[in-house]
Regions:
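Flavin-dependent oxidoreductases
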Residues: 20, 56, 70, 176-294, ...
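Glycine-rich FAD pyrophosphate-binding loop
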Residues: 26-47
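C-terminal catalytic lobe of FAD-dependent flavoproteins
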Residues: 148, 251, 286, 290-425
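Glycine/proline-enriched, intrinsically flexible loops and inter-domain linkers
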Residues: 389-836
Length: 836
């Protein structure tokens, strides 16, 4: 086959994702797109070819739900979707509670046709189920099955019909050339193609292909067992592939679905079986296909018993035999999310990997938008390939987390649940001190961060009834009342915080100012010694990130951002840098300690002869001071809304700084405080927004209540959109709500955790003019104000202080009141403490 000598884009991989990316690129106006695969068409041998092809709509992740819903829309438009309905059944009370959570998520994301069923109702829809084995089910009418191979063919044909797509099956990639850190050429068995961009959509082979370019895609091939049994007498004469709802037996990590005259049974309950991409055979050597391995019967024995329990009529029928059984290979990542976006290793090299059939077309569309327009309609920050830190890309980490996550595919995962594998990778220099204080560690970007300290138990007695106690087992998981006690200790005296997980990078050189001006919404041409908190916008004026920037010199800026977003922010700034600017990652060479509270100044003053008075050290400024024997960069800024500083030192001096502050703080009642205070209680009392919660690309600065009086003259990414937003009436307004009554029908008090739908008093969903529904973006205690605080975007007519609404939580509706519309804090609304 003759290949073009040049392509604007080469898409490698003809599964559902590759076909979708290629089609949507041509739909958005790109020509000279080449789509190739080493396998034959229509089934080149990847995971698409053996996928079960059913799609459930509801996920607790807003991002994944949006990609799935868009995929279903596209499958329907292509005529390859059969709506069958689906039921997730529960064998336990805990699972029934989880199904009520899924009902709430459906409400938050606008999925209709959902209901909770009792066993009899499940039996009416799935007559071959043994209803005595279950307590109930969660029905989603919009569930269905697709013909993903046919969908891929139709997409290819659309691109070819437009004259913009060249398709090359049976063409293997042998190399990807990179020059000056940018992709230049794709080498194949049929010749070379000069390429401006390359998209790797190779599924389980993606890491191997990425390595050809010196890049990394962190995923591992893993086994998912499936069998087909039949012929099933009940399905004899079936007029379509599926006529009964698909069943997910959630407590056993299994599913059962009609497949014509057969029953397909799949499992995520067996032991994790992982492979390396190099272990996958070539197409010509595979017995069935490169991603269909021999079935290991021993791994399925227990699962077959579970299927027999649930569907004895079919599975127990001796006339129904096994017709097909495989260890199907699919992609797993260390955090369970796809790997999308431009590689941080090589410019022009894009990834669309670890994407399953259910979100394939939606992902292809979103990635194409990102490539063409610089962003997608759906916020993809949780799937961004740039999110991974270096240790998270290692083979050992990928395999450890993938193995742990595999059996949680249908698991009940708490919003705060922590990973157990591959911990203690990044430790603060004062980690031993924290352990001595009984720190309970949560992980952030590999860093072990104290969430609370068990040594603060005496504070529970000190603050007594001011501390909320949770009695519900669910809300008590991964939580302690000590968080609220530490919060009050900080508010009344002072708190010491481990902020080691910050990502810190310097931008220096003659082009430094122009680089940060381009990326930041706020004015960065400020005097040296100033600290600027700034949103970072996407081209359409949504939130790419939010962070602080210190100007340390005429040509020296220090960017400080969160650990989770750190690597993506680093790539974003690096991509915007102009000539004469350089970026240096300081994260592993510095450590940060936070000191806040009304006595923070007294504590710091006891360690230094420098002037730290309000007149001598204004809020929003930074400078180097001497703390004991150390030179410390002190930044007077606060994310908890109290007087204090972030203190930066070289990492080898961090222990000494901790000890110095701890000793100085003892007479002042200094308490070690965890991230439960920093990231939740302190933040929410001040109505501070958080990236990934309140701040997403789907919302703008005006809606978030973060507009400044003026817009700087200098250009920056998203400026045109931002100016337009300032002239328009916002479609939604960020509000702070408080819960009026926590009592459930049982009398137990319940506390929302986030992502619950907000409803009107007559129980109607609130949707703005752009189609975005209202849901709780953040939730947590406000110990100083004595309220449980929720944040949510509301339409202008509902964003009225005093307006009463409802929040749906665990199958019940609780009254809430709009306490703030906009940015005014609940606690210290005049900001007198932070500026004291």
């Amino acid at each position: 086959m003759t290949l073009p000598a040049h392509a604007r884009c080469v898409v490698i991989g003809c599964g559902i994702v590759g076909n979708s990316v290629a089609y949507h690129l041509t739909r958005l106006g790109w020509g000279d797109v080449v789509l190739l695969d080493k396998g034959p068409l229509p089934n080149p041998g990847g995971s698409t070819g053996h996928a079960s092809n059913f799609i459930y709509l509801v996920d607790h992740s807003k991002e994944m739900t949006a990609l799935t819903m868009d995929s279903v829309r596209q499958y329907q438009e292509l005529g390859v979707f059969i709506q069958s309905g689906g039921i997730e059944v529960a064998r336990t009370k805990e699972r029934m509670q989880e199904l009520t959570r899924r009902m709430a998520s459906a409400g938050s994301w606008g999925i209709e046709g959902v209901s909770l069923l009792n066993p009899t109702q499940v039996k009416e829809l799935v007559p071959y189920i043994d209803e005595s084995m279950i307590l109930g089910g969660f029905s989603t009418a919009g569930v269905g099955v697709v013909d993903s191979l046919r969908a891929g063919t139709l997409m290819r044909e659309k691109g070819q019909a437009a004259g913009a797509l060249h398709v090359a099956p049976k063409t293997e990639v042998t190399g990807i050339d990179v020059e000056h850190e940018r992709v230049r050429r794709v080498r194949t068995t049929d010749g070379d193609i000069e390429a401006e961009t390359v998209v790797i959509t190779c599924g389980v082979w993606s890491p191997r292909v990425a390595r050809m370019a010196g890049a990394r895609i962190p995923l591992t091939p893993a086994v998912h067992q499936m069998i087909d049994i039949g012929p099933v007498p009940r399905f004899r004469g079936a007029k379509s592939d599926i006529e009964h709802p698909i069943v997910r037996d959630m407590d056993t990590n299994m599913y059962e679905r009609q497949a014509g005259g057969d029953l397909e049974i799949g499992s995520y309950a067996h032991r994790p079986i992982l492979y390396d991409p190099e272990d996958l055979p070539p197409v010509e050597q595979a017995a069935l296909s490169p991603t269909e391995f021999p079935f290991t019967q021993a791994d399925f024995e227990e699962q077959m018993q579970h299927a027999l329990e649930l569907m004895p009529e079919i599975v127990g029928d001796e006339s129904v035999g096994v017709k097909y059984a495989i260890n199907g290979i699919l992609s797993l990542t260390p955090d369970g999310m796809p790997v999308l976006g431009e590689s941080p290793d090589v410019k022009g090299l894009w990834s669309a990997a670890a994407v399953w059939v259910k979100e394939g077309p939606g992902t292809g569309k979103a990635l194409a938008e990102w490539m063409v327009h610089g962003e997608s309609e759906i916020d993809l920050h949780s799937s961004d390939i740039a999110r991974f830190h270096e240790h998270q890309k290692t083979r050992a980490h990928v395999r450890a987390r993938a193995a742990e996550g595999f059996n949680k595919t249908y698991g009940i995962v708490h919003p705060s649940e922590q990973w157990a594998s591959n911990r203690n990778i990044r430790l603060a220099p004062f980690h031993a001190r924290e352990r001595e204080l009984g720190a309970v560690f949560f992980e952030a970007a590999g860093w072990e961060r104290p969430q609370w300290y068990e040594s603060n138990a005496p504070l529970l007695e000190e603050f007594g009834d001011r501390i909320t106690r949770r009695t519900s087992e669910w809300e008590s998981r991964w939580w302690s009342p000590l968080i609220n006690a530490e919060h009050l200790a900080m508010r009344e005296r002072a708190g010491l915080f481990d902020l080691s997980a910050f990502t810190v990078f310097d931008i220096v050189g003659p082009g430094a100012l122009a680089s940060v001006q381009c990326a930041a919404l706020r004015q960065m041409d400020v005097p040296a010694g100033r600290v600027v908190y700034t949103p970072v916008l996407s081209p359409n004026g949504g939130f790419k990130s939010d962070l602080t920037i210190m100007r340390l010199g005429d040509e020296h800026f220090r960017v400080v951002t969160g650990g989770a977003a750190g690597m993506a922010d680093k790539k974003w700034f690096r991509d915007q840098m102009v000539g004469g600017a350089e970026l240096a990652d300081m994260t592993s060479s510095m450590t940060t300690i936070g000191l806040w509270g009304p006595r923070a100044r007294d504590i710091l003053a006891d360690t230094t002869s420098d002037d730290v008075s309000n007149e001598g050290f204004k809020f929003g400024s930074c400078r180097t001071i001497e703390v004991g024997t150390q030179r410390v960069l002190a930044s007077r800024i606060s994310y908890v809304g109290d007087l204090g500083w972030e203190l930066y030192v070289p990492i080898e001096q961090g222990l000494k700084l901790w000890d110095t502050l701890w000793e100085a703080g003892r007479p002042h009642g200094l308490a070690a405080c965890g991230i439960g205070v920093y990231g939740t209680t302190g933040r929410l009392e001040k109505c501070y927004r958080a990236h990934g919660n309140e701040l997403e690309t789907e919302y703008n600065v005006v809606e978030a209540g973060m507009t400044a009086p003026r817009v700087k003259e200098e250009d920056f990414i998203g400026k045109a959109a931002h100016l337009r937003h300032r002239e328009e009436e916002p479609a939604a307004i960020m509000c702070t709500l408080t819960v009026d009554d926590h009592r459930s029908k049982s009398g137990e008090k319940r506390y929302m955790l986030g992502r619950e739908p907000i409803l009107t008093r007559d129980r109607k969903r609130i949707v703005d003019r752009l189609g975005r529904g209202s849901y709780v973006t953040s939730a947590g205690a406000g110990p100083s104000v004595g309220k449980h605080i929720l944040m949510a975007y509301l339409t202008p007519e509902h964003a009225v202080v005093g307006n009463r609404l409802l929040v749906e939580y665990m199958g019940e509706r609780y009254p809430v009141t709009v306490a703030v519309a906009g940015a005014t804090p609940l606690f210290d609304p005049e900001n007198t403490r932070i500026r004291a």
